[in-house]
Every structure is written in C-alpha cells, then in structure tokens.
Amino acid sequence: MKLFKTLSVAAMAIALVATSITGSTASAASSLKGKIVVNGSSALLPLTLQAANEFKKLNPKVKISASAAGSITGPQSVRKGIADIGAVDWDASQDVPGFKKFDGQVAHKVAVIPFAAVVNKNVTADNLTTKQLQDIFSGKVKNWKDVGGEDADIIVVNRAFGSGTRVNFQMKALQGTDFISKGDNYKEVKSSGDMKTAVETTPNAIGYMDLVYVTSKMKAVKINNIAPTEANVINGTYKVWGYGYYMTKGEPDGAVKAFIEYIQSSKFQNGSLKKLKFIPISAIK
Amino acid sequence: MQLETSVQSLKMGTEESELGGSIKAGSGRMLDRKNRLLFYNRSFKIACIASASFVCLVLFSILFFMFRTGVLTFRDVPMATFFFSTDWSPENESYGAFVFIFGTFALTLLTLLISVPLSIIIAVFMAEVAPKWMRNLLRPVLDLLVGIPSVVYGFLGLTILIPLLRNITGTNMGDGILAAAIVLTIMVLPTISRISDDAISVVPRKYRDASYALGATRFQTIFKVTIPAARSGIMYGVILGMARAIGETMAVVMVIGNTPQLADALFKPTSVLTSNIVMQISNVPFDSTWNNALYMMGFLLLVISLLMIVLVRLLQQKGAHR
Amino acid sequence: MKSATTGTRGMFTSDRGMNNFNNRMFTFFVWGISACIILFICALLYLILQKGLPSLTWDFIMGLPSEMEEGGGIGPALFNSFYMLLISLLIAVPLGMMAGIYLAEFAPENKVISFVRICVEGLASVPSIIFGLFGIALFVEMFQVGLTIIGGAVSLAFLNLPVMTRVTEEAIRAVPQDMKQASFALGATHLQTIRRALIPTAVSGIVTGICLVAGRAFGESAVIILTAGVTTSGEMWDFNLLSPGETLAVHLWYVQSEAIVPDAVSISDKSAAVLVFIILMFNILFRIPLWIKERKSR
C-alpha cells in the first residue's frame, strides 16, 4: 500500500510538471479555473467530450474529466459528490417509470435527442401506429402479418432496464406501457452499438435507438405515418424525442456554470451539436 | 542480540587498541557484512511473507466486500425466493436468481462437453504426434489465443457465428447457450489444451517405452497409459478452463440474448450470472435491493469458483496418494 | 475389446490387424481434428489482422480520438493501455514474485500454508467481473476517487497477482535441487542463492508468466470499464493517476457500443488488429531473449 502511495505521488508530480509545461504554451485567454467531473449517460458522452475539448481550448485552466457508465449513475454521482455534472437522458428531478426523482438537483436541458423505431431491412411494414408499437413491444402481437408485414415472427430487441433510451422510448413512443420481459423471440442488448448490430443482422427484428445511430443497413419506421426526421421533430409532428439533461446539485457556479452555459450557447448548439446529429434545444418551440 | 552487542563492544575495544588499522578495518567489514547479509535475508523473508499474506488478504477482502453488500439482499428478499424462484423482474420487486444460476451451470457444462474432447485431442497432438518444429510453433500460437480480448471474440460471435447458426438451424435468432458455448469453447481451448499438453509431456518416458515393449500401438499407449497417467494434470486444466467459462463476461453478454428465462433449449435467449451482472450493474441505483442482489450474484459466482479450486486440490491430493 | 477376456496375454495383444487399423484411424483422426482447429485459429488471427493492419497509419495510432469527424485516433487509449499495464505490473510482479518465492522456498509444509495455496488458486479463479465490482466498492465507494487510472491499475494488479504468484512458485520449484545445494555449499546465503541461482534459472518460466499476465491485462475490458471508465482525458501523455483510464480494449468496446463517428467500424477493426498485434509482439519480444539464452547455454 505504501508503495502504491509513493508511486501515485511520484506520478502526480510528473503529471504536474507535464501539465505546467503544456499549460504555459496555451494562451491564457480566460481566468476561469477549476475541475469539472462529468459522469452518467453514455449516449450523451460524445456531446460532452466534444464540448469539453472546445471549452478547454477557451479556458485552458479548467480541467474536465468526463466519463460514462449509465444514465442513472449521473445523478447518483452528483448526489454522492463524486461528480459535478450528471448527464442523464431524462429529467431526473422528476419521477420516471422505474426511477425515483433526485431531490435537490437542478436539471439543465442540453440537447434534443430524437429516437426511432428501427427494423431489419427484410421487414416490409414501414408504418406503425402507437397501438401497434405498444402491442409489439408488450408481446401481444407476435407476427409481422398482423401489422401489415409478411408472415414471420417478430423478433423484439430491447435495451436493458435502466437505459435512458429505453426510458424515453417507453414514455414517448409506447406511452408508458410495459415491455415484455421474456419469450423465445426476445432479447436484450447492452448498448446502442449492440442494438445496431442486432437489428442489422437479425431478420424480422425490431428495436429502437437514438436517430443518430440509424444507418443505411436498417430501416427506421414511420410512427403514425410520420417519418422520424429532424425536420419533423422541429415542426412538432414527430413526438418520439426527449431532452438530454445535465443534473447539478443546486444551482451551479464557477467553471461548472460556464461549461453548461457554453453547451447551451447558440455557437455550440448550432455548430458541433448539430454536427453530432443532436437537435438544438432552441429549435423546439 | 547478545552476540551483536558483544561484537559491538569488541569493535569498540579495537578502536583504541594498538592493532594495525588493516586488521581493524578488515574485521569490522567482515562483521558488518555478516550482519548486513543477515538483515537482508531476514527482511527479504519478511517481505515475502507479507506478500503472501497480501494475496490472501485480497481474496478475503473481496469475499468480505461482496458478502457485505450481497447479504443485504436478504433483508428484502427471502433466501428461498432468491435461490429457487425463476422470476427475475426487479422493476416489480421479484428477485429470483435461479434462471441465472441454472444458466451458468448449463452453459459451463455445454462448453466443457464441446471443449474437453477437442482440447485433449489437441494436447495429444502437440505432445505425442506432431513433429517438434510444429510443436514449437503451436504452443506460442495457443498462448496468443489466450491474450485476444474477449470483446473481439464476442464481436466475432455476434457478427459471424450467430448469422451462421441461424442459417444452419433455421431458428429465428440464433442467440442462446449454444452460441455462447461455442464462443467460450474457443476461449477455453488454449487453457485446457496447454495445461493438458504439459501434463502429458511430463509423463515419464519409461511408461511409454514399457507400453510399446508390450507390443502396444501408439493409440493404445496414449489411451491406456499416457492419458491415465496425466489424468490429474488434465483435470487441473479442465477445472481452470471451467473457472474461465464460468467467469467470462464480455463475450457471453454479446451472444446469449440476455433474457431472464430458463435455458431449456439450445437456441433460447437466456442469461447467466456474469452477463446479468454486467448488463445491469451500471444502470441500478446504489444501495437498492437490486444492486445488492447483483452483488449477491457476484458472491455466488465467487463461491462457485472457490469450490472448484477446493475440488482441484482434492483431486491433486488423490493423485499424489495414488 | 477381445483383449480384456484374454487376461493372461496382457491387455495389448488383441487382433493385430484391428489394432493397426485403429492406430492408423487414430493418427489420422488426431491429425485431422488438429489441422481443422489450427486452420481455424489461423483463420481467426488472419481475419482480425487482415481487416485492420493494412489501413493502419501512424496518425491513427498516435492521434487523438474524435467524437464527430472521421479519422479519430487511438493515441490516449493506447498510451493508457501501456501506462496501466506498467503500473499494474509494478504492483503485481514484485508482490507476486515474492509471494511465489515464499511459497516455494520459505514456507513450511503445514495446514496454514496449504490454506494459503488454496487462497492463491482461489484468487486466480475469481471471475474478472468480480474484480471490477471489488474495484467499484474500493475506489468509487470507499475512497471516492471515481473512475481513474489508479483504480483500474490496482484492480488489474489484483487480477494478476495470483497468476504471478503461482507461476513463480512453479518455476522456482522446477529448479533442480543440486543447483540450490551447490550454491549453499559455496557459502551463499539463502537470499544470494535465490537471487543468483534460483531466479536466473527460473527466469524462463517467470517471463512466460509475466507475458501471460501482460497479455491478459492488455486485453481485459470488464474490469477496466467498471473501475477506470470508458473515456480518456483526451490528452496524449497524461501521467495523472486520477485521469479516467480507458484502454485500447475498452476503446474497442466503446466504439462498437456507443460511438457515433461515421467510421466506427473501421476504428474498431483497426483497434482489434493493433491489440492482437501488440499481444503477438509481447509474446515474441519476451521470448527472444529466452531463445538466445537457451542457444547459448546449449
């Protein structure tokens, strides 16, 4: 244990020297100082990392350490004081299906995330009503022919409980109905990437994911005759979307406040955030 | 201690004596050197004991941590429900882990059914049949296989094996314990075959010579003499492979389907202890019954693998007495 | 088998023709199955390397990862892999070797020591995910440092400690007794004997062990996802032990699971190739000195 203490001290000393060298070369554009720790949703991680990179260029004295494990770890880490910002796919200051609210935390909207129900390329059905979606994901409808497709079993691919995408899809697309939890043609996957691979490679599969992950190797179905596109989200016809939130303990100040303000600024929202295929919060009326 | 003080006083004595400097210095250094060596030896031994105790300490603190958190499960869930109920839906407060326990055993058994015969054949091939150059080439290649990240295996399983299984069998999904067992077979094959290979290689030459002298063919020698003689080593390999199969996580989670239902068919999506832990651990609130139940499942895994080690020990002792 | 009934003639003297047939079949069978498996292994390695290696560039290996544009690199993740490997080896190798030496050289044969051995083997068989959970309990919940390089490295070291111990013990035990006695006869102390005679002789086994351990640590993902996180600090050469410590194996997983860069597939192919290639290099580099030594001593 002592060895490991001395080692860590030594390494930290090296790190200090290293950062002081690199730090001095960057221009001291801002006097803002501090360390920001972000934890939580992995779906928001690319956004956070991109924002952190840009923010660090403007404020070289601020250190940002971003990580992700799962949505619920965000507000939890904030409550425990391990993280300053908890990234989460739903408003954690309210109750949602499966999760209690976190008292004393303030939610900051940072992005709009559209979700899409996706099917394998071989599925002929391309429009599903809310009722049909509810029936499919609750296991009442088991064959594609009942919802306008060919005669084949429906393979339901679901995200694991606790996934932010799952919470949002359940609330917005299924309007709160429960998922099936077992069956011969049902599986759960751990991440958006696994969902993508599963839907791409499994014939007759249906799943759902952030619109960002939809590729040309799968098909995003229309919901109630409305295609999941950015434009339809903005004009208010496509309803299956949610906000991405940053949770803080009370109102933020200092570097944390500046960072959240940077993410909410129109420069970032209309620049990198759009490039990452999220929708700016200001676009929603 | 007494000796040391007397040496000290002797040195003090010589300090003022009429003796030549060379003797004084010489004897002083000699004694210093002896003390120093003694000191090094002692402290080295103490450091070694400390390290060995540290290893035990790590194991016990792991056991302690897992148990401390896991046992809290039983505040809210009766023990019988946890172990024997097949209903795992934590969102509705039912915590029955039987599906996962059963899945773990079923998956391990199936993996061993496929991998043990293959591994032993490979081991026999390397130790007895293959020419020397091939042996020297094969062993590092098998070692290399151990080092391939399990993520890579899982990904290959998801993108190549599962579509293949689906096409061959005509099932809807292909996920299930068979797919997981095949992936695991590839992962434990090097472990079992390398250890069996070593065990077969150290069977004394004279056993084989005696067998050949009795007119046995190579086939007979291997099956009736060499393999029985190497039995305990092979068992050790099998059990280590088994431990790896039980504990493997990232590869299994990608091909098993992750559905809490009993694995009563080869192609039915199911779940095992490890895959369920890794699927859910980052998505559950700390300090919830759910979190505790996952730790309890971890503790179970730990107990299963420790039991297996005790089994190995017993086997080895039996082997030694024989 | 007929031989079983003709007891007095020994168990091997059965129908000669049948035996020869069996023997040939067996040899054929073993060659066949082995060839299949070896071909399979080679195909697997080829598949992984061929997809990634040809398109590898220096920019990819040293570059910073990108979150939205193509052409992101794996520099910090690769650096973290080596850095964490180094720290974990710095902890695991000395401790593991000393524990191994203790078990092989000093430990008396009694109940306590056989219990210690069971502990070592038990620890060796603990599933890696358990080390991850333990790491969370220790570093995230107890010390509250969050997901850091040091947390990941120490958890990795715990994972490797028992393997190192066992390998060292076996290697030292395998040294012929004569060697040890000769050293003692020359008046060497126990420590000198261990340092000058036993370890140099056992070095081949120990190095194989380190190799094994390093390979395992390099490819490990479950432990690191849970204890060191899935991000880097986004800087190259970040020696800070409290930075998040995503390694290459984790990056591979992350890119496959969550990344939204358009070239995620190519990044994961290339990362997999780099990983396998490095483990290949470990195996070769560690072994070359041993081969040379073997040649010399011959």
Regions found by a protein language model. Give the residues of each.
Chain C
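Transmembrane alpha-helices
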Residues: 190-228
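Generic hydrophobic transmembrane alpha-helix motif, especially the helices
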Residues: 121-157
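Periplasmic/extracellular loop-to-transmembrane helix junction in inner-membrane transport proteins
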Residues: 9-32, 47-90, 109, 254-266
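Membrane-embedded alpha-helices of multi-pass transport/permease systems
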Residues: 42, 94-101, 130-133, 151, ...
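C-terminal transmembrane helix and the adjacent membrane-cytosol boundary/short C-terminal tail
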Residues: 169, 173, 211, 250-298
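Transmembrane-helix boundary motif in ABC transporter permease subunits
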Residues: 88-120, 133, 286-292
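Interhelical loop and adjacent transmembrane-helix boundary motif
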Residues: 68, 72, 224-276
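Glycine/proline-centered hinge or cleavage motifs at structural transition points of membrane proteins
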Residues: 127, 186-187, 200
